[in-house]
Amino acid sequence: MDLWQLLLTLAVAGSGNAVSGSEATPAILGRASQSLQRVNPGPGTNPSGKPQFTKCRSPELETFSCHWTEGVHHGVKNPGSIQLFYIRRSTQEWTPEWKECPDYVSAGENSCYFNSSYTSIWIPYCIKLTSNGDTVDQKCFSVEEIVQPDPPIGLNWTLLNISLTGIHADIQVRWEPPPNADVQKGWIVLEYELQYKEVNESQWKMMDPVLSTSVPVYSLRLDKEYEVRVRSRQRNSEKYGEFSEVLYVALPQMSPFACEEDFQFPWFLIIIFGIFGLTMILFLFIFSKQQRIKMLILPPVPVPKIKGIDSDLLKEGKLEEVSTILAIHDNYKPEFYNDDSWVEFIELDIDDPDEKTEGSDTDRLLSNDHEKSLNILGAKDDDSGRTSCYEPDILETDFNASDVCDGTSEVAQPQRLKGEIDLLCLDQKNQSNSPSTDTAPNTQQPGVILAKENKPRPLLISGTESTHQAAHPQLSNPSSLANIDFYAQVSDITPAGSVVLSPGQKNKAGIAPCDMPPEVVSLCQANFIMDNAYFCEADAKKCITVAPHVEAESRGEPSFNQEDIYITTESLTTVAGQPGTAERAPSSEIPVPDYTSIHIVQSPRGLVLNATALPLPDKEFLSSCGYVSTDQLNKIMP
């Protein structure tokens, strides 16, 4: 429908001016141009078989040319059969007439060339094709819209560098702009596009457009040959011109061998596997040394442990075995002298020569004059010639906790005062009966001094003598025994052969010493002043011999009725029936050593003493001394 309308419009215009080419008004030309662009907007196929515009181009924005095709229905070529007419608008008005093409030869066959005299930029043009006076095709455009530059010329390349592997190389491609384009003066601005490919490939690789006339091409293989071409376009335009001639690039072979494939060192994989391997090695090291690393970072808390003691004994509650082990080692022995601080040590005065004639060493040791001395514990004794000091080589003992604990001095004070009163009473009676006491044999008293407490404290007497030899040092001054307690009850016998003595209890048998006859008191009081004690058989014989007149009274009223007494004897009744044997007892009495060597300060007034070595008696005097109980002693005493 539009085509018929166009033909009708052209027919009306042709009838108005048939000779001059039918000058049309601008309004009619504008409508015809719009109709032509809607019908045939650009070059393409010609389905109707009539002549048609193929393209219009300006290579440098100064001239342009248009090309068309012949119709298929024209069997005979007639130079004057197809004509091109154009019209342009100047000063906002269209020219009133159509003008024919100025040059049909310069641009080639079926073309019209417009030189610079007929070319104006920024001004629209309209062209039409006529055949035998009929318009067959029409087109309107502006010169800057149809610019398609000529191909660049003078392509060449330059080698930039070769890779270290000798496989790839970089080149620089250069060219010259089209010769007819006034690029130097800036009349036209061109953009260039470079394309390259390997010779045997069909797909071109395009690079980004550039404004310069040179561009680098990277990573070309040395063993390949490449084709390079360049084309251009006006800046901000979408239509490129023709491609330049193909440039062949043949890179020199620098490597001694031809590589078929590019060798890329797998640095990334090596780094990944290296990190993974190091991590695994670190984990294996930590796993194998985890206990040692744990001890270095978090050292274990040391378990409380006593050297030489098995911890299983403490867990099982075997405290007796632990105490035995502690008693064996000198470092863990209990310090018996730390409970009461009012007696620190015993001072032996070696400067006073008069004391040598006053009595034995035991008398001076047990006297009250040196009870609170402060120094010279280890001074050399004048009589014995030995050093009286603490010797750590004490025999191994087994003390319980109850044997070590000391009672308070306040509790022991009344009992001590009572003992002093009894001893004073005994001393008075001895003085009143001096004739009888002078003839009596020397009495023997225990030589161990300890503080009297609430409960009995065992005393260990260590020495090389056997357990059947009792320690009875001789006392020349009976009045020095006023403030001492005698330990005569054996509470235990250690495996080493030492006896542990406990203090006896005074005046618990129900007999007052002051009421006894003076003869008995003077002779037997020193030996039997304590109940709960062991008594030597020889001492019992002395008492029986000296005091026969009180035998019936002693049997009628027993003086030792204390319970819980463990007394041992071999043949006490036999001795009682043989008075002759009792008479010979004093003559067979063995010498008693003095205990002047201190082993342990066990309590405030308790000492562990060593017996002074004495010459061995004859074999006939080495009979053992039997121990008798108080009940048996009462039976045999007169």
From Swiss-Prot:
GO molecular function: cytokine receptor activity
Topological domain spans for side Extracellular: 19-264
Lineage: superkingdom: Eukaryota
Signal peptide coordinates: 1-18
Cystine residue pairs: 56-66, 101-112, 126-140
Keyword Transferase belongs to the record: no
Positions occupied by motif Box 1 motif: 297-305
Residues bearing the modification Phosphotyrosine: 487, 595
Post-translational modification note: The soluble form (GHBP) is produced by phorbol ester-promoted proteolytic cleavage at the cell surface (shedding) by ADAM17/TACE. Shedding is inhibited by growth hormone (GH) binding to the receptor probably due to a conformational change in GHR rendering the receptor inaccessible to ADAM17. On GH binding, phosphorylated on tyrosine residues in the cytoplasmic domain by JAK2.
Gene3D superfamilies, sorted: Immunoglobulins
Ranges facing Cytoplasmic side: 289-638
Keywords: Cell membrane, Disulfide bond, Endocytosis, Glycoprotein, Membrane, Phosphoprotein, Receptor, Secreted, Signal, Transmembrane, Transmembrane helix, Ubl conjugation
Localization, UniProt: Cell membrane
List of residues that carry Phosphoserine: 341
Annotated glycan sites: 115, 156, 161, 200
Comment, domains: The WSXWS motif appears to be necessary for proper protein folding and thereby efficient intracellular transport and cell-surface receptor binding.
Family, similarity comment: Belongs to the type I cytokine receptor family. Type 1 subfamily.
Protein name: Growth hormone receptor
Biological source species: Ailuropoda melanoleuca (Giant panda)
Name of the coding gene: GHR
